[in-house]
Structures are given as structure tokens and as C-alpha cells.
Amino acid sequence: MANIKSAIKRAKLSEERRSHNASIKSDMRTAVKTVETLVTNNDLENAKEAFKTASKKLDKAARKGLIHQNAAARQKSRLAKQVNA
């Protein structure tokens, strides 16, 4: 554990950011899984709506630096291919 005051503050801030980033990534993964389950159940109307939400969450995560922009684009492309099939 850190002994210096500034190091203690940095450790606390780092933990807060880690938990915040983890929640955003979790929401993103949940949105992607929702689209995939709706597609497998042939519920294409709801899948298209869920795809819009998932796309927004992927873009936001990429913008925040939680995932790479190309990774977000790749996931969106694969989801779009499933929804439009």
C-alpha cells in the first residue's frame, strides 16, 4: 500500500476509474449479447432496435479508449451482418 499522500490519492482514483470502466464494458457486452440472442430467436424487429443501442455503446467505449476503434468497428460489422441476414 502507498505511504505517500499523492500516491494514496492516485491509487484511489485509479480504483474508481477501473470500476467505472468495468461497468461501461459490462454494459457494452450485455448489449452485444442481447442482440445475438434476439437474432438466434429470429426476433429481428427487436434485434434491430437492440443493435442501435449496442452500436452506441460500442462507439462510446471506443471513444473513451476502453476498446480499440477497429475492435468496435469489427464488432458492429459482425452484428450488422447477423441482424441483416
Swiss-Prot record:
Keyword terms, alphabetized: Ribonucleoprotein, Ribosomal protein, RNA-binding, rRNA-binding
InterPro entries in alphabetical order: Ribosomal_bS20 (IPR002583), Ribosomal_bS20_sf (IPR036510)
Annotated GO CC locations: cytosol; small ribosomal subunit
GO biological process, one term: translation
Record region (Disordered): 1-24
Gene (name only): rpsT
Name of the protein this chain belongs to: Small ribosomal subunit protein bS20
PANTHER family linked to this entry: 30S RIBOSOMAL PROTEIN S20 (PTHR33398), SMALL RIBOSOMAL SUBUNIT PROTEIN BS20C (PTHR33398:SF1)
